[in-house]
Amino acid sequence: MPKEMGGPGDEGATNPEQLFAAGYSACFENALRRVAGRQKKNVREASVTANVGIGRDGNGFGLKVELVGHLPGLQREEAEALMHDAHEVCPYSKATRGNIEVTLSVAE
C-alpha cells in the first residue's frame, strides 16, 4: 500500500499508480499515432510518458495525471494539437474525463 495511504510503501514493488501510468501512456500513445496518421503527420519517433500521483482529495484519495508527449520533428503548436486530439479519442481519457485531473504537455 502506498505511503500516502498509510501503508509501508513497499520499496521496489510496483504500485497501483505505476500500473495505471503504464496502461494510460500506452493507450494514449496508440491514440496519438492513430490521430497523427489520419492527419498525415509523421510520429514514428513519438512516445508518451504518464506521471501519475495519488493524494488526498475531498472524499479520501484521488489520482492526478500528467501526460507528456515526446514528438520530435513537430512544431510545438502541431504537437500540442495532436495531444489534444488524442485526448479526445483515447479510451483511458474518456474513462477518466471529469473524474480526475489530467494535464497534457509537450516535452522540450
Task: Please tell me what each predicted stretch does.
Residues 1-25, 29-108:
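Extended beta-strand/beta-hairpin segments
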